[in-house]
């Protein structure tokens, strides 16, 4: 029921008002809306038109809700939007299970893969400059020939990863980053700040020369 207070959208006919002496039936026949007094003194619409008013109100509410939802989707945080995993992203990549996904050869500069599960994902030859793999699980992933300059592998699980001929110049691998079982043949670790135990382990398996930079893996690791 629609309550009209202060300003009415329609003029109401008081049902308690006496009919005119000159036209006894004029009010009953020409007044589309009748009103009665509520206990609080407010006029209450009692005519059949109230259903029309109610329907209009519902329609306005639905349109308002649709506009609100549309606006929220339009202004969503670019970092989490469908094409906003990074400046050159192709999909949502942060905090996702992307196991086995194929990113080979793609340009994913500064892509955000934080906390994502990337087991057996294929990044062969991908451009991943400045990408973040913070606390991500890259177990068994293929990063061969990938450009990983400036990438962040802090706390990442890089176990059994193929890093053949990957360029990791200036990458971050602090924390508990693990390279256990990874293939680093020809990988370039120039200016990568490694812990002593990480360096010792990698030097045991280091071999080859990076096909792009021409740097020997052992030299970039500062192995003795």
From Swiss-Prot:
One of its GO terms (cellular component) is chloroplast. InterPro entries: 5peptide_repeat (IPR001646), At2g44920-like (IPR044213). The keyword NADP does not apply. Residues 1-34, 35-81 form a transit peptide. It is found in: Plastid, Chloroplast thylakoid lumen. The keyword Thylakoid applies. Keywords: Chloroplast, Plastid, Repeat, Thylakoid, Transit peptide. Residues 116-155, 156-196 form the Pentapeptide repeat domain. This is Thylakoid lumenal 15 kDa protein 1, chloroplastic. The lineage of its organism: Eukaryota, Viridiplantae, Streptophyta, Embryophyta, Tracheophyta.
